[in-house]
Amino acid sequence: MILIGLGAKARQGKNYVASYMKEAIPEIQFYSFADELKKYCRNHHNELEPQWQLAHQTNGTPLWKDDPIYGCTPILQWFGTEVMRKKDPNYWVKIVEEQLSKVTPNSINIITDVRFPNEADFIKDNGGYLVEVIRVNEDGTRYYDPGRDPNHLSEVALDDYGNWDFVIRCKSGDFTSLRYKALGVLQAIVQMHSLRDGSVPDGSGDDSDPSSLGPIYGGSSNWSK
């Protein structure tokens, strides 16, 4: 199994990177530590919002707006981090671990939202590869999502993490460069994994051009140990 973790801050392009990788190898599967959190919040938002308002001494316009998921980032952060991670830091990790226990040995799996050191450690402990995705403004400064608290633990927990295997840095809106870099990282990971585990990728291409990955880029992940 190839396991890839994408981190770390919000709105950096992690989902774009994942989608470009899946474009190259359609068999790639996505996982997210926040999937179950979003499902729970969707089903229990009428209970959670008053609790969040009380915990933060906040009253006023409901946070859920028209969408029970994408309009409630503060509640997702609060319940996922301050509530459930306090009970068990690995609560969300264990759910993904159970899901990954059912994948086939030659599968390629991407976790799209690595935000905390224990989540990153889970990737590394399972022989995976960590990719930090960094979005920068036109002037080269780091982009921060204006709709989120930049100091929330889920945004800063990996600021000093030094165990990334790859870093993809790209300007806002430069999707051509982002795609090129994503495919280059995918190619490198497949090759590294092949050398490490003795598997043989089916196909070859020009290392200088990730779009020439041959059968790998064309959608075949027929590599075996």
Residues covered by each model-derived region:
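Extreme N-terminal starter segment of soluble prokaryotic enzymes
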Residues: M1-I4
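Small-molecule kinase domains that catalyze NTP-dependent phosphoryl transfer to phosphate-bearing small molecules
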Residues: G7-A10, I95, N118-D125, E132-D209, ...
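Walker A/P-loop
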Residues: N15
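Post-Walker A helix-loop "phosphate-sensing" segment adjacent to the P-loop in P-loop NTPases
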Residues: E23-F30
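Conserved acidic residues
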Residues: I28, S107-I108, G128, D165
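ATP-dependent small-molecule kinase phosphotransfer cores
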Residues: D35-S107
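Short, well-ordered beta-to-alpha junction loops that form the rim of enzyme active sites
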Residues: D113-F116
